[in-house]
Amino acid sequence: MPKMKTHRGSAKRFKKTGSGKLKRSHAYTSHLFANKSQKQKRKLRKSAVVSAGDFKRIKQMLANIK
């Protein structure tokens, strides 16, 4: 059986925390900031944790990430 390969696109987007959760960044942060409120832009700066429903799928893509 061949080795599982890490999905490189996912590896660049997710980081594992010390407790084993996955950190992610928010979408909608690349352009068109004039249309967004200051509050929305401030909230988008913070990182978020991957939801439980997506965790299993993403963990499988990140097979070899420690």
UniProtKB/Swiss-Prot annotation:
Biased amino acid composition, Basic residues: 1-26
Domain of life: Bacteria
GO biological process, one term: translation
SUPFAM superfamilies according to UniProt: L35p-like
Transmembrane segments annotated in the record for this chain: none
Keywords in alphabetical order: Ribonucleoprotein, Ribosomal protein
The keyword Ribonucleoprotein appears for this protein: yes
First and last residue of the signal peptide: none
Region annotated Disordered, chain positions: 1-48
CC per GO annotation: cytosolic large ribosomal subunit
Example GO molecular function: structural constituent of ribosome
Record keyword Ribosomal protein present: yes
Oligomeric form and interacting partners: Part of the 50S ribosomal subunit.
UniProt-listed HAMAP family: Ribosomal_bL35 (MF_00514)
Family: Belongs to the bacterial ribosomal protein bL35 family.
Name under which the protein is recorded: Large ribosomal subunit protein bL35
